[in-house]
Amino acid sequence: MLTDMEISSRASLTNVAELGAELGLLPEEMLLFGSTKAKVDLSVQQRLAGQSRGKLIIVTAVTPTPHGEGKTVTSIGLTQSLKAIGKKACACIRQPSMGPVFGVKGGAAGGGYAQVVPMQELNLHLTGDIHAVSSAHNLGAAAIAARLFHESRLGKVEFEAQSGQAFLDIDPAQIRWHRVLDHNDRCLRQVQVGLGENNGPVYESGFDITAASELMAILALSANLADMRARIGRLVLALNRQGQVISAEDLGVAGAMTAIMVDAIKPTLMQTLNGAPCLIHAGPFANIAHGNSSIIADDIALKLVDYVITEGGFGSDMGFEKFCNIKVRQSGQVPSAAVLVTTLKALKANSGIESDTDINTPDEIRLEAGFANLHWHINNVARYGIPVVVAINRFATDTEAELQWLINAVNQTAAFGCEVSDAFSQGEAGAIELAYTVVRAADTQSQFRLLYPDDASLEAKLSTLAEVGYGAAGISLSDEAKQQVREFTSLGYAYLPVCMAKTPLSISHDPMQKGVPKDFIVPIRALVLNAGAGFVTALVGNVMTMPGLGIKPGYLKIDIDEAGEIIGLG
């Protein structure tokens, strides 16, 4: 079989202007980037304000493993197959960060014959949205540092006289706005800034990956440009010496930060291998952020097509949970059905049983033990009142006997249905039955419900997520986290939903606990207020907001050939 890059490079593409017209966009609603991609102007939202809405399908997965479950492959394959059976469909996915592209995970365009193309354009830069987020974020960091410098240098009276601005009295120990970078670089996690003569005051800071920036979450959760501007104004950059919030609006930098992102708020239109439309927008990670593409992209697509396929990052305890409790809570766009992706390899890897047997070899004991993980995720999705279809992403080494065993086992659960998907190897033809089953599931009446109400306390929300969302015995709050619960509550932010930042490699906080962990306590070491995005992040265990590169990083495989074409992406 050809590589992903070879398949992408040989694809016959529809000109993006024609693709947009087929989708229902007007020429003036598209800003073309050559013939392969276009920005979609938000004026389409006003033009279609009264349009009836399509059905939203959320794709999630079992607990991730190093073998890859194929969630994006399934999302794109399903979109292609819906088109093949005569349904008007559109995928809405996140823009890939270059951190994972050059790190371990690789690209995020799908794979095989279920891809967004050209895949190299999607995986590297696209239309520059992530760079815009980085620049806007770092402007905020530069602004707070400069304000601290000048206030410290001049004092209150002289600063106000010379600048005409109010003295903010910034507490250097309470500057909460790090800088960001779209790469994995562990050495920047903790830094001192302001070193050297006339560069201070010195204070502790750090870098996060851009996907963890609150601005990225704001981009994904804003309803329109005015909403994004208001959210950026609410960003908490620091506290003053009296413990009061200093926002981006207080600093006078919110307008400029918004100006940098004025084009980033527009989704990018691309296509799948069979010419189905795909809107790419925003890129928050699901382990350290809320892990879903934008509300704006969903809103536009739902007004133009019958079925919108979107996905939440990692397993259903991560991106799907945050899709429900954060994204849907803010958007009101309720899903009609969910697709839960699994593989035979994933279940064996999640069995918790050590074995010398190759993961591709039939192993009834590990498969049955690992099924508990899939069963947990089925029940987790069903907990939100959404019909769930299990999609088994077939690998070439899978046996018919094990596939049939798994289908029979799934049919004894709360799942609406179960289908094997060959989208990777067969493209649109490989997920036809999955498409029909998803359509039937979406036609049933979804009884969507949130996991907790807005008016629950922060501690109650944390407990509910741990105990109901993960099956934990409870939570433990560090002294710092307890103080932050009190602080955020006193500042009036207890109504916000909670975003758990934890490992994606286990339902629990411990990546070594496979399958369905029990009797564990979730350790919450700190909270982060994201007043602009509209949620409180809980840092669980040792999760990092700046990843590091591994011993065999992905960049080792990436190069250009003699013709100047990029090779090694995938």
Swiss-Prot record:
Q: What class of enzyme is it?
A: ligase
Residues annotated as binding ATP:
65-72
Q: Which UniProt keywords apply?
A: ATP-binding, Ligase, Nucleotide-binding, One-carbon metabolism
Task: Please give the positions of the paired cysteines in each disulfide bond.
Answer: none
The UniProt entry, under SUPFAM superfamilies, shows:
P-loop containing nucleoside triphosphate hydrolases (SSF52540)
Pathway the protein acts in: One-carbon metabolism; tetrahydrofolate interconversion
What does it catalyze?
(6S)-5,6,7,8-tetrahydrofolate + formate + ATP = (6R)-10-formyltetrahydrofolate + ADP + phosphate
Q: Which domain of life is it from?
A: Bacteria
Task: Report the EC number(s), separated by commas if there are several.
Answer: 6.3.4.3
Q: Give yes or no: UniProt keyword S-adenosyl-L-methionine.
A: no
MF (Gene Ontology): ATP binding; formate-tetrahydrofolate ligase activity
User: Which terms under GO biological process does the entry name?
Assistant: tetrahydrofolate interconversion
| NCBIfam families listed in its UniProt record | PRK13505.1, PRK13506.1
Annotated family: Belongs to the formate--tetrahydrofolate ligase family.
Q: What is this protein called?
A: Formate--tetrahydrofolate ligase
Source species of the chain: Shewanella sp. (strain W3-18-1)
